[in-house]
Amino acid sequence: MADCLSSQLERYANQVASSAGIIISHLKTLKDEPSTLPSETTVPTAIGTAQLQLAEAAFQLLHLTRDPGNVLTNLTVDLQVISSVRWLLHFEIPSLVPQEGTISYQELSCLANVPDNLLRSHLRLAMTCHLFQESGPTGMVAHSAVSRKLASDPSLAYWGQYFANTVFPTATQSVNATATWADSKQLNETAHNLAFDHRGTFFDYIAQDPARTVEFANSMRAVSTTGPFDTCHLCKSFDWSSLGDGVVVDMGGSTGHASITLAESFPSLRFVVQDLPDVVSDSIKRLEERQLPLSVTSRIRFQGHSLFHLQPVKGAAVYLLRQILHDWPNQEAIKILRSIVPAMGPKSRIFIADIVLPKTGSIPATEERVMRCNDLLLHQFTNTLERTFEDWQAIVSRVDDRLQIQHVYRDPGSILSLLVLEIV
């Protein structure tokens, strides 16, 4: 029997007070207190746990205290917030507002070449979500901590532009895609096909233009720096130091963001990052531009390779597929895994870092909703869906009789699980 409303309110309110108390005590020990909380992945474990618990309890309280009759009002607000963020990104407002100091609406509208009244409307809605702020009695525009990060962090800017220009238009075609193709499993009958008026698969579409390939790679690198997807969770999901100086083949590794994170944490491991030639060429340049220590870059090399071709690197310690297989239907996922098996040595493992869909309500809602969101995004782009553990088992069982899932782990705060596959 479900808790009564008063019990739920009391439980979540107590959790908010308790978790906030832990975080406040920690903040008071710091020499320079930050204006916003850092990612839970960058603070001591107890503080990170408190941040996650606080976010979940506050989220539940928000929904418990909302009138169910206002659901459409709330959804309308959420939709317009998304629309305003897209508008602000399109006209490059974050980069036009000074990093420090203020700017008038009139001057900002001139710089962006947009109507003053529309600029005010979009900015003031965004301000209710802590994007930008007004300063002074005359209403000057200034950055908030969030918008300043959006303007100054290239990775976040890439993701913002990709969201505005690709993800948002694709999502708006979801209804039309279902109405047109119903239960189609074809990779080229998707919301993305309708949004961008093309007849190939999503990966065909980005491969047709090197700029699209690079844009997609940059957006994936950006996503990997956000809390639920942060590559640091990968470091905590396995005892990587036990591999010594073994080789990790980062298949479909894009710009090498996962390998770089692992290389920085485990100084003996070596890495081969594989992806399409256009991505590899750009990634090598980007690695050089980052000016990372030689102790890191000397252990990372890039290699052009198709996921569906036989794996050329033999006997690696790990073949890593991070957020790769979820892009492909079952049959293609099986082909990708089969391409690896002949290259495996007696101690080789395949690591699948992907979402394992939970039973509804079995994990914090703040984490589950990100997984469910990703589930729909996949369908809109590739006509695939995220998988349950049973789905993953079914795929692995069809690859090779000897290949088995030996271990599954999900780091707290991560939406990705690590499935460890071995030949037994």
Swiss-Prot record:
InterPro entries: COMT-like, O_MeTrfase_dom, SAM-dependent_MTases_sf, WH_DNA-bd_sf. Pathway: Secondary metabolite biosynthesis. The keyword Transferase applies. GO terms for molecular function: O-methyltransferase activity. Its EC number is 2.1.1.-. Coiled coil: none annotated. S-adenosyl-L-methionine binds at residue 275. It holds the Pfam family Methyltransf_2. It is an enzyme of class 2 (transferase). Signal peptide: none annotated. One of its GO terms (biological process) is secondary metabolite biosynthetic process. The active site is at residue 326. The keyword Transferase applies. PROSITE patterns: SAM_OMT_II. Keywords: Methyltransferase, S-adenosyl-L-methionine, Transferase. Cytochrome P450 monooxygenase; part of the gene cluster that mediates the biosynthesis of bifonsecin B, a dimeric gamma-naphthopyrone. The first step in the biosynthesis of bifonsecin B is the production of gamma-naphthopyrone precursor YWA1 by the non-reducing polyketide synthase albA, via condensation of one acetyl-CoA starter unit with 6 malonyl-CoA units. Belongs to the class I-like SAM-binding methyltransferase superfamily. Cation-independent O-methyltransferase family. This is O-methyltransferase bfoD. The gene is bfoD.
